Amino acid sequence: MRFLSKRILKPVLSVIILISIAVTVVLYFLTANENYLQAVKDSAKSQYASLRESYKSITGKTESADELPDHDAEVLDSIMDRLHEPLYEKDTFDPNEVLAENKQLYEEFLLQEISEPKVDNLVRSGDPLAGKAKGTILSLVRNSDLEDIISSIQQLEEEYNKNFGYPYTFLNDEEFTDEFKDGIKSILPKDRVVEFGTIGPDNWNMPDSIDRERYDQEMDKMSKENIQYAEVESYHNMCRFYSKEFYHHPLLSKYKYVWRLEPNVNFYCKINYDVFQFMNKNDKIYGFVLNLYDSPQTIETLWTSTMDFVEEHPNYLNVNGAFAWLKDNSQNPKNYDYTQGYSTCHFWTNFEIVDLDFLRSEPYEKYMQYLEEKGGFYYERWGDAPVRSLALALFADKSSIHWFRDIGYHHTPYTNCPTCPADSDRCNGNCVPGKFTPWSDLDNQNCQATWIRHSMSEEELEMY
């Protein structure tokens, strides 16, 4: 079995380490020669360090990883088998039929009336806990985005934040102008907390480890394949920053939750409960509204790199991960084949509500470090959406990931449009319930039916 040797060696090494410590303690009390004692202590320390390094080498663990699950070898083998095999055998399905079935499932689900999650712990405006979660609304924007981000803020304030008063945090790789800062403050209540931060060049610019000549060559190839933003270096910087850097910014150190807000998006329905408190009280670490397939050309080696990482750190895997969502090869089998094993399903991160504790955890941080060393943010066009989604699907319990079906949201060209009760004025009528996109040729880019089918528990389904 793949992981049997580790399970045999770990307890043996632990016993050896304990014996070394015990010998040191005994000698401490038995010897009076200070020089000899120091030599013994130094020798014991050296042996301990050597043994500990051997332990870490064999287990793939760091010191703090001892708190992570120590999976049974048989369980790990089962998970790894699932991650190495497609969900469906080739020639057992017709992608066109799968698409038709998935589209029907999605539309039927969205046409069910909804007002809010059916839980008994929603926090309303006026409740002592309303607006008190450690959360902020985050925007990574340029000075030139002022008009478009104002549009997004005004809608979010009207539909949600005027009742809860959560602060805003704005980040930019350049200094914000007075015009930008004054423009933002002018549309918000005077007591609304607003902070503006600059991203340091080390956290934004292309790392020195990237071979500039290779980057130029690879992006030239992608550009010829009409891959969007391939040759826009700042886009690569943004994807890397939102994958592995933003949650380290000093302005975010005091927060547990972030709600990401992009320029020029639309909100269609009132949200009458504190979303951050919902996350906190219902053990959710991630919230999304749209769930898409990615362009496989941009992430050609992301899955194989991820699997290499998982093989080195199997203890990071969550036994209740969203593995089937990652491995469903039935709607877009070409994506799966191109990436050598990944459906390319991902949460569209232009809207995300995320628990920063997950991003600051050892599995996520180690994963980011590994991907950074691979260089795929620049040699390919790895996006923060597939990167974040892979980490969540592999390292988190899928029940802690929540689809906010009740939130009406649009980012061109896709929409999450719920059906509000007929006697309700919660939604403004500016979107068509269940209509994912106006362009039918983009319907095959919707991965939400796959999430419904494979990842939503009965509890999640009953929540709406």
Curated annotation (Swiss-Prot):
Topology feature Cytoplasmic, residues? 1-11
Q: Which GO terms describe its cellular component?
A: fungal-type vacuole; Golgi apparatus; membrane
Q: Which residues form the active site?
A: 352 (nucleophile)
Region annotated Stem region sits at 33-130
Membrane topology value? Single-pass type II membrane protein
Give the residue ranges for region: Catalytic. 131-464
Record field: transmembrane: 12-32
Q: Which GO molecular-function terms appear in the entry?
A: alpha-1,2-mannosyltransferase activity; mannosyltransferase activity
Q: Lumenal compartment: which residues? A: 33-464
* Cell location: Membrane
The EC number of this protein is: 2.4.1.-
Mostly located where?
A: membrane
- What is an annotated GO biological process for this record, any one? protein N-linked glycosylation
Cited function: Possible glycosyltransferase that transfers an alpha-D-mannosyl residue from GDP-mannose into lipid-linked oligosaccharide, forming an alpha-(1->2)-D-mannosyl-D-mannose linkage.
Q: Which family does it belong to?
A: Belongs to the glycosyltransferase 15 family.
Designated name of the protein: Probable mannosyltransferase KTR4
Classification from the root reads: Eukaryota, Fungi, Dikarya, Ascomycota, Saccharomycotina
